[in-house]
Structures are given as C-alpha cells and as structure tokens.
C-alpha cells in the first residue's frame, strides 16, 4: 500500500501543493551535475518522504545518507546537504569538509536550507573557514500534506520556542505557509484567532498581503472562506488526556510518524521477531479511513463484524454459481490484507487497553477534568513517582492537574517538585523550569476558572454513546475537547456570543474581515449553514493549531464536518501532530 496518501478526494487541491514541492526539490537536485550524495537532516527525511518517494530520489542517481557528526562515506564528487537551519548541523557539515580536505579529497558541496537560509548558520560556516567552498540555496518547504484534510508545518518545537524561549520565528513560518496557500487558492477574507501566537500570525499574514499581495485575477474566486487560528496554550487540557479514537490510540501507544507506524513484525503476524516493519496509515487504506475516527471500542466490534461476514462469504463460495457472484467475492478478498493488518493492530492495542494501569490512568484523567477530587489524584501521582513510572506519564498527569486547577498549592508544588528530582535525577530541573515558565506546571496563585469553562461549554457529556455518537465527546469517551467546542462556536456564530468565556482563557482574541479582499459568495453566511459555492462544492474553513493538534481533535472536526446541516469542509493545519507524551517531551531537557 502506498505510504503517500493519494489526496484525490481532498476538499482543496493539496496534491498541487505536494507536486510543486516535489518539482522544486527535483529541480534543485538536477541542478547539481554528476554523481551526488544527498545527506538529509534525519528530522527532515520523514517530511521529504511524504513529498517524494525514496524510489523516485534513487531514480535521480542519488546516494542517500542521514546527517550525523561522522564523515560522509561516499565515492560521489558532489555532496548535497538538505538541512533545517540548526547551528549544530553547521558544525557537522564543516567537520565533514575539513575531514575531506585533510584527506585531499576533492568534492563540491551544496547546502540547501529548509525552508530558508539563516545568517547565524552561514556565520558558523564562515568561522569554520568553509563558507567559500559551499554553494548555499533554499528549499522553501513550508508545509507537508499529511492526508486529504491535514497539513503539517513540521514545527515540532514551536510551543516550547514561543512559551519558554521567547523565540517567535515559527510564527513567521506559519504565516508564510498560509500565505503560500492563498497564492494557490485565493485570499481568505474572514479571520478568527484566539491566543497570543494566533493573533500575531494574523497580523503577520495581513502585512504579507500588503507587502506581497495575492492577485485575485491570477487565482480566481477564493476557495477558503474562513481562517480560524488557535493557540495550543488556550487548551492544554485536551492533549494531556488519553485519546480513545483508533488513530489517536495508535499514536498514544505506538507513535505515528509521517503517516506510518513502526512495529515489530511479530505484531503483524510474521514469524520473525525483532524485525521492524512500517505500516502506512492514511486515507488510501479504505478500512482505515472508515475506522480511524471511531472510538476504539467500536473499531473492535466493526472488525469482528467484517471478519464474520467474510467468513460467511467464504463458506458460501462452494454454492456460488454465477461469474458475477464470483467477481464480488474476489473483490472482497482484495480487502483481506487491510483487514488482516487492522485486526493485528487492534489486537496489539488491546494488550495495552486491557491493563489495569491504563484504566486507572483514564479514571484519574476523568477525575481531574471533572474537577471532582484533587486529593485522590495527588496521591495517585505520588504513587506513580514512588513506582518510578515513566517521567513523561507522571508529568502529563501533573500538567493536567495544574492546568485544570490553575496550579498546585505551594506546599504540594514544592514537595512534588523535590520528589521528582530525587526520584528521576536533578538533571530534570531544567525540564521542570521549562514547564513552569510555560505556565503548565506552576504554583496556584488564584482560584481556577475551569469549572465555569467546563459548565458553560458543556465539556462533560454524560452517557456518551460511542457507537452512535451525537456529540464530539465520543473521541474522549465523555469529554468534549475544549479546542473543538471553541472552533464549533467560531464556525457557527463567531466569537462575539462567547466573549465572557474567551476572556477566561489564555491570550487575546480577534475577529476580522480582511477588507478590500474579494470573497466567495458564502463568506458572509458563517452564522449558520450556507448553500456552499455555486458549483456545488461546500465552502472551506481552514483551522490552524499553533503548538500542535491531536488525532482525536482531528477526528472530532471530521465528525463536525460530516454532520447534516454543516455547510463546510474543514481542513486542519498544524505545527505538528502531538499527543500528551510528545508535547511534554519537547519541554524535556537534560543537563550536559
């Protein structure tokens, strides 16, 4: 099965975005004549594989390597480095070149920065006396389509950069990516933003349109009506909760990276243990497309039912008479590999979800979100520390405690901090400082407003029917993600009716019509359902998460888009797909 999703059914022509990036990269590589070795920054290789298959790169006559501190072992006379603007990488590249010079190896060197070159990086190449030996260019990859309705800006550290380091360069990158979309699909005339970073991106985007305007005559009628920008900081509760959709749970337990998950081959039914295999997970897999957004409990039932149906079909094949019936049966057999793959995956997930520890964790999360009994949760977290459970698991629950309670009482905060450092090592003091600076794990200074937010936005939905959901709360089995409730309101009635609630959440908010820009016919009808655009397609809302989005939140948005009376298709763009663990890990640092 193709690792790259086809994108054929995307509400926007995301394939054109992907094809453009592929062409740009191929042209850059073709500009370098002769035998060449492409040395890729390891974090970029996944993004590049979603733009152009490795097989296509090899067809260009390339050797492929990952960038490390070790010298590049190749006979090629041209070495092309494809890297993000990271200072440590410049040291690696300089040492590679110096190593070649010491061995009297003559090569041509090219450094392609993604998405743009950096003065600080080039300064290091100058200091290392290799800048004059290098041809520097840019590969402007600002976004990668992950699937038919999901775009990633591939900025995994943006949340820490903004909240801890005060580095807001990622916000320019986000605005640039959105502006690039506008050059393809027209200027987005309505904007709603919530959070410091989001309001800043909206401002940068407006300035970009003034400095480098999109010509409406070139792109025709705008395809995207509305842009909703949301800071992750506005809702840190949701990612700290365990996702209970199929795709979300796979990410929680196995970690999905660039649209695929890597598992031991024995998980997928192979005899050989210890060998890893990649399982692609995207909309090209019809069964995955059907099940990815369902609550995991339901997925198990769906797979069981499909397996039973296939078994019945198989027993009936003996009495099959007509060619047409045979043809139908063979068609069903074609879906067997998909079925087998997902039965194996679901079986593997069940070994985790059936554990007492998994259910205890869910109980604690529910208790914290419902703000019922903080004492029980505090004792549970203490016990986790004494049992030396993984630090990310402990911090995840602590952050959930802190965010729903506006911090920990001073005595508890000091005690738990000391316990963490004693149990896990004093090198984690930097991690705790980062979380405190980001406002995620702090001392309580005032009473929490979580109860008001929870009650007003109906975040707890009793008796959630996961098999026939009538609310987005099914994705967390009873908790409706705060982020998606806000987006729900923004789509249907804008920010104005919920001003009081928005003031209780972090950061400013903004609602603006970008005057002077032509809009599509339905742009003024955000208050309720519109009739879509003239050619029968639905209007599009672009939802941008700054700081990351979870798969469960994406599932909740897909659920909203599928509801009767919903006049919009939703496209999600994000700095990175995250879960509680991966988000916590971005704040984790060790000394030395």
From Swiss-Prot:
Cellular compartments annotated: Vacuole membrane; Prevacuolar compartment membrane
Keyword presence, Cytoplasm: no
Reported tissue expression: Expressed in roots, leaves, stems, siliques and flowers.
GO biological process: vesicle-mediated transport
Role played: Involved in regulating membrane fusion at the tonoplast and the prevacuolar compartment.
Residue list for modification N-acetylalanine: 2
Protein name: Vacuolar protein-sorting-associated protein 33 homolog
Subunit structure: Core component of at least two putative endosomal tethering complexes, the homotypic fusion and vacuole protein sorting (HOPS) complex and the class C core vacuole/endosome tethering (CORVET) complex. Their common core is composed of the class C Vps proteins VPS11, VCL1, VPS18 and VPS33, which in HOPS further associates with VPS39 and VPS41 and in CORVET with VPS3.
Pfam family, any one: Sec1
Family statement drawn from the similarity comment of this UniProt entry: Belongs to the STXBP/unc-18/SEC1 family.
């Amino acid at each position: 099965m193709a690792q790259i999703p086809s994108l054929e059914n995307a509400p926007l022509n995301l394939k054109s975005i992907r094809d453009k990036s592929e062409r740009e990269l191929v042209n850059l590589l073709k500009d370098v004549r002769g035998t060449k070795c492409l040395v890729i920054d390891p974090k970029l290789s996944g993004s590049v594989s979603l733009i152009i298959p490795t097989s296509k790169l090899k067809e260009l006559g390339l050797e492929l390597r990952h960038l490390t501190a070790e010298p590049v072992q190749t006979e090629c006379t041209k070495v092309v480095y494809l890297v993000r603007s990271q200072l440590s990488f410049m040291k690696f590249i300089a040492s590679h070149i110096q190593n070649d010079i010491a061995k009297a190896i003559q090569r041509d060197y090219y450094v392609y920065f993604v998405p743009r070159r950096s003065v600080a990086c080039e300064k290091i190449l100058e200091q290392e006396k290799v800048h004059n030996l290098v041809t520097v260019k840019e590969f402007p990859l600002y976004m990668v389509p992950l699937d038919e309705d999901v775009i990633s800006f591939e900025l995994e550290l943006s949340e820490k950069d903004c909240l801890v380091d005060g580095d807001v360069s990622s916000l320019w990158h986000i605005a640039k990516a959105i502006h690039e979309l506008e050059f393809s699909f027209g200027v987005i005339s309505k904007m709603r933003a919530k959070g410091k970073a989001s309001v800043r991106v909206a401002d940068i985007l407006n300035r970009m349109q003034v400095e480098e305007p999109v010509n409406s005559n070139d792109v025709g009628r705008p395809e995207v009506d509305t842009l909703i920008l949301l800071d992750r900081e506005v809702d840190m509760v949701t990612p700290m909760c365990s996702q209970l959709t199929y795709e979300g749970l796979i990410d929680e337990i196995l970690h999905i990276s660039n649209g695929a998950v890597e598992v031991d081959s024995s998980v997928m039914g192979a005899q050989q243990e210890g060998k890893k295999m990649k399982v692609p997970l995207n909309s090209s897999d019809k069964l995955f497309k059907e099940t990815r957004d369902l609550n995991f409990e339901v997925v198990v039932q769906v797979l069981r039912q499909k397996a039973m149906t296939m078994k019945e079909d198989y027993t009936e094949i003996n009495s099959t008479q007509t060619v047409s019936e045979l043809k139908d049966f063979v068609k069903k057999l074609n879906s067997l590999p998909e079925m087998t793959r997902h039965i194996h995956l679901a079986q593997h997930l069940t070994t985790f979800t059936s554990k007492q520890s998994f259910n205890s964790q869910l109980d604690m999360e529910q208790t914290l979100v419902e703000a019922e009994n903080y004492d029980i949760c505090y004792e549970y977290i203490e016990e986790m520390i004494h049992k030396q459970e993984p630090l990310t698991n402990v911090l995840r629950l602590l952050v959930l405690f802190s965010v729903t309670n506006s911090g920990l009482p001073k005595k508890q905060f000091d005690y738990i901090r000391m316990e963490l450092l004693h149990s896990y090592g004093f090198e984690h003091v930097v991690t705790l400082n980062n979380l405190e600076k980001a406002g995620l794990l702090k001392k309580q200074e005032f009473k929490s407003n979580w109860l008001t937010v929870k009650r007003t936005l109906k975040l707890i939905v009793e008796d959630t029917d996961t098999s026939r959901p009538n609310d987005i709360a099914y994705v967390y089995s009873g908790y409706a993600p705060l982020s998606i409730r806000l987006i729900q309101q923004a789509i249907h009635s804008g920010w104005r009716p919920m001003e009081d609630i928005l003031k209780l959440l972090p950061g400013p908010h903004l609602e603006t019509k970008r005057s002077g820009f032509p809009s599509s016919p339905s742009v003024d009808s955000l208050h309720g359902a519109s009739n879509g655009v003239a050619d029968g397609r639905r209007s599009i809302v672009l939802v941008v998460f700054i700081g990351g989005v979870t798969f469960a939140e994406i599932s909740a948005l897909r659920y909203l888009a599928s509801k009767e009376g919903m006049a919009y298709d939703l496209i999600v763009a994000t700095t990175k797909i995250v879960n509680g663990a991966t988000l916590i890990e971005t704040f984790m640092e060790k000394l030395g």
